[in-house]
Swiss-Prot record:
PROSITE patterns: FAD_FR. This is Uncharacterized FAD-binding protein C12C2.03c. GO terms for cellular component: cytosol. Its cofactor is FAD.
Amino acid sequence: MAPSVATSLKAEILPSPRTSSPSSNFKTCVSNENGCINCRCSPSEPHESANVDESVNKLSKTFSKLSLNPTFQALNMDLGLLHENITLDRIPKVPENHVSLIDIDEARAKEDPNFQIHSTPSRMPPHYVQPHPPFSVFPAPILDVRELTKPGAVKRVFHFELDVSNYPLPEGEEWMVGGSFGVMAPNNEEDVDELLQLLHINPDQADAPVLLKTDGGRWPTIWAEDTPRELVTTRRELLKWTVEFMSVAPKKQLIRLLAEYAKDDTERQVLLFLVSRLGQRAFCDLRDHNVTLITLLKAFPSVQLPLDHLLTVLPQLMPRWYSLSNDPKVSNNVLEFAVTVVEINKVEGGTRSGIGSGFLKRLALRFLNGERDLVLPMYRGLHKNAFATHFASDGPMCLIGAGVGVAPFRGFVQRRLTNATCAGKVWVFHGCRDQELDELYHGEWENPLQKSSDDDASSTVSQQTETEMDSFEVKKDGTSGPNHLVVESRSHQHAYVQDEIRHRGDIVWSVLSHPHGKVYLCGGKKGFLDGVENALIDVCVQYGKMSRLEATQQLALWQSPLNLKYIKEIW
């Protein structure tokens, strides 16, 4: 980690012995910016020249005051290069403002038939949010929610069931096994309230109608026509449904905008340093620590940021995608899916949930606490993801998933169980941390249409691997259902899915070498993808009698559009 701010400032802000005058001025100038090679955080943009005059004594005092701010301290920025003789160059120009907000009265607002003043938080996005035009976002009633993990699991996973009997499917389209759908998850109400407060917008202003004007682009519609637009909305509605301010690392455009509206000279100088060439390392480190706009506004409290200018630089709030965990043909007009709640460490301490998973967690808890009449804002999309378009109705298959990545394979198994001759040709490699706490859909793989209960008897037999506590389970009789192998890691010598792929290499190779065999992979990219693909290469080397280079090339060939024997969905 970088040295603490207090240490860096004390050492670097005091006048240098080589400086003849204690009132030397900071200098800032700009030129073309190359950006950061490591994180690619700074695209080439127009730059400007600027001079910032600040006496060293005044700067020292104000830095001391700034360092008392606990949020500023939590950023732990390395400001060692920021001293009285600094020359700041390659500072981006202030982003142009392409948005305006004009207050209007309610009578004028009612002229827009789509505008509604909500006395309670709206459950659905405004009409102009169109992720799949010309179709609107659909309020799918939530039929059921259950928690798939048990207390003590590292991550919580919830299962949802949605009623889509009234969904306006276009003629000739259907819900497909392996398909995915979009959820229009809003920003958390508490985060929106906090941001409004930091922007000095009171509740009456937040909910008052405004006329939004844009110079062009698709925002705030997502995918509507790229054109200038005027529409009636509210400030709260825009922050809740149309912009990302919690889940995207800050870009230099945003930092530069904060600097422009900082009333305190020292705060402005720190912000300019972060977007300068010399501050590149500090900027990249800042982006790596889950810093949000709210954190920055707390760390630099003198910033008086206008909402219209802020909306120009914030990215569009995009839909979150979830894979179906059931076969829609078997479960008529019901869509099922699972979601892992993502918890993110906050730089100032504590955790926060992800945008999509946090929204779904809040809905799940409300349902489990007895609340009904809940809906999920969702839409079908194109159903063009790899699993939906390349599901195989026959032939042997290996389904490899870790954590919630195994959920779409439940739908695969449901479909294959409708054909008794195909059921035993399916092998599910199911990775989890602890089978007792976080094995998903426990007891449902032999009959996925029947929900499990805590006292369900397992039809699997546990066998020990080379490590004392790591075990897998494999169904004894694979003729009447899928062969379900659970790989769990509970000891210091972890066993992962890739270990079981090697252990069962003969089975995996029998699928890969079959003319109609397919291997499906689903899970997180970090660690999991490389581990599984290395294991598949090892299987090809051992059982296919290939060199490692040949096996690597063969795996790539199996992923080509003309072959598609190996199909993956990775996030």
